[in-house]
Amino acid sequence: QVAMSSTGVIRMSAARSTYIVPPSRALWIPPDVEHVVTVLEDAEIRTLYVHPCARFLADAQAPDAASPFAMWPACRVLEVSPLLRELVPHLDTAPGAREPDERERCIAALVLDELRRAAPVRLGIDLPADARLRRLCEAILDHPTRWTSLEDWAAHVGASPRTVARLFRSELGSSFGQWRQQVLLAHALAMAARKQPMATIAAELGYASASAFTAMVRRTVGQPPSRFFATAP
């Protein structure tokens, strides 16, 4: 399954991860993954269901046609190219649709090829199993700028900062600061999709300047904000 929105921002949550997906990205969801899709703002969602027998087109770089299910066993966020965005509305999505004609089969094959070529984006946010830490993480996802310190967030769930720091390491393999940066990036991407200026995004997320925010983005994803936050027209 591929979920994407032509307008607005969606959030998809599986058992141990959540993804905030703006119109410039799509989310690949493998079979048998229970998930919940939440509309964060007015959004037009399109969902593509990929047949189990589907194969990517073969080419010089990949001479053997591969299955997307074999290549992508886990959820992943993909960049949406202008071509992919234009192709999707031409697929017949009506319930009980007739057998696709040759034109639709060609479009579907090209959609799969665009998905194969799409660059993955590190937008997944891991979620813990521990109930206290899960409650804290969900609160941060809902209000990422309410507090900045670990001490304040730990008090919110009635735990000591030391306990919360230990849980972040044992449950998520990262520090509180590293995990919160991923949340801020996801929310920044949603704000960029609404065409908000970089200075406004930086200020909203608690950064003293746009340059400080730019440095964080480069350090975290290895791309400048102009590239990472690029959205399809």
Task: State what each model feature region is.
Residues Y19, R146-T148, A159, S174, ...:
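Residue-level signal for the short linker/turn that defines the boundary of a DNA-recognition helix
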Residues A155, R166, S170, A203-E204, ...:
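Alpha-helical residues within the helix-turn-helix
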Residues Q1-A74:
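N-terminal regulatory/effector-sensing and dimerization cores
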Residues L91, I140-P144, A188-K195:
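Short helix-to-turn junction characteristic of helix-turn-helix DNA-binding domains
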Residues D42-L127:
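Compact structured core domains
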Residues S24, V164, F168, A212-F213, ...:
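Short hydrophobic/aromatic patch on the recognition helix
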Residues P73-C75, P95-S160, S170-Q182:
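Short, Lys/Arg-enriched, Trp-marked, Pro/Gly-tolerant hinge/linker segments that flank
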Residues E151, S170-T214, A230-P233:
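Terminal helix-turn-helix DNA-binding modules in bacterial transcription factors
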